[in-house]
């Protein structure tokens, strides 16, 4: 299950969203919003209120190739809940 979460996104925007209990992850492209919600709730034991997703554009590599597209999920938790990886 944890293989579906590729990485935790740490950008300026994602750190600003941490104050309002929103966490940003890069996830597997084939996951739906309900799959992401149940995955986070089962892994961390928190209550997920909303999941927003968007697909990032492909990036060109240096020598004539492209990197695959990824899906980014912004997860909003119930007030008072936090993820242990950010403590």
From Swiss-Prot:
UniProt feature coiled coil, ranges: none
Gene Ontology CC: one annotated term: chloroplast
Pfam family, one: Ribosomal_L23
Superkingdom of origin organism: Eukaryota
PROSITE patterns the record matches: RIBOSOMAL_L23
GO molecular function per UniProt: rRNA binding; structural constituent of ribosome
UniProt xrefs under InterPro entries: Nucleotide-bd_a/b_plait_sf, Ribosomal_uL23-like, Ribosomal_uL23/eL15/eS24_sf, Ribosomal_uL23_CS
PANTHER family to which the protein is assigned, alphabetical: 60S RIBOSOMAL PROTEIN L23A
Quaternary state and interactors: Part of the 50S ribosomal subunit.
Family: Belongs to the universal ribosomal protein uL23 family.
Role this protein plays: Binds to 23S rRNA.
Name of this chain's protein: Large ribosomal subunit protein uL23c
The organism of origin for this protein: Ostreococcus tauri
């Amino acid at each position: 299950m944890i293989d579906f979460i590729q990485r935790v996104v740490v950008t300026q925007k994602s750190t600003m969203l941490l104050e309002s209990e929103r966490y940003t992850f890069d996830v597997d492209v084939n996951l739906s919003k309900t799959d992401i919600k149940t995955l986070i709730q089962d892994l961390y034991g928190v209550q997920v209120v909303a999941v927003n997703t968007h697909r990032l554009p492909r990036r060109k590599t240096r020598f004539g190739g492209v990197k695959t597209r990824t899906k980014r999920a912004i997860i909003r938790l119930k007030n008072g809940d936090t993820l242990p990886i950010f403590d």
